[in-house]
């Protein structure tokens, strides 16, 4: 599945490695160098090959869109600005505030990158002969799991915080479904 998607991506000559992790967590992620990981826990919620292709295509999208290098540049810029503010003012509080602001800015770009990866992944799926709507199905599964975690937390008296908090790199799943 992965190699078929790569062959129909914007970087068909790059080398990608796909690994299934024995983890119950509902997650998948990409690392620089074309390394893509899917957790066993996510597979339990997928019903079709096309849905798995959607997960993998989204992660390929992070790599083809150079999200890792863009995020690194943004983080470096944020650190330089915070350090400059500290040097100019001598205020540790200003440094901390600048770092927090920088983290939020980087996080905001991350949300945009998630939507870019969704769009790139949908294109790679289409070119590979998969129904790109399967990616929407996966996002729907993630939204359902997010709601389930909230209900469980509330029922057990725990805070109903969500994975998609202030500094999360992912947009809300309902926003992703609308896009």
Region roles according to the model:
Residues 1-179:
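A Zn2+-metalloprotease active-site environment signal
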């Amino acid at each position: 599945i992965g190699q078929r998607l790569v062959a129909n991506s914007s970087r068909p000559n790059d080398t990608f490695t796909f690994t299934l992790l024995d983890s119950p967590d509902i997650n998948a992620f990409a690392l620089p160098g074309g390394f893509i990981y899917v957790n066993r826990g996510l597979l339990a919620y997928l019903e079709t090959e096309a849905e798995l292709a959607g997960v993998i295509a989204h992660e390929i999208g992070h790599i083809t869109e150079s999200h890792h290098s863009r995020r690194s540049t943004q983080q470096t810029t944020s650190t330089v600005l915070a350090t400059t503010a500290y040097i100019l003012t001598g205020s540790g509080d200003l440094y901390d505030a600048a770092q927090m602001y920088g983290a939020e800015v980087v996080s905001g770009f991350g949300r945009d990158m998630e939507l870019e990866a969704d769009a790139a992944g949908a294109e790679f799926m289409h070119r590979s002969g998969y129904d790109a709507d399967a990616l929407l199905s996966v996002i729907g599964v993630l939204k359902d799991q997010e709601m389930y975690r909230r209900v469980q937390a509330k029922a057990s008296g725990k805070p109903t915080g969500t994975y998609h908090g202030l500094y999360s790199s992912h947009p809300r799943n309902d926003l992703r479904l609308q896009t």
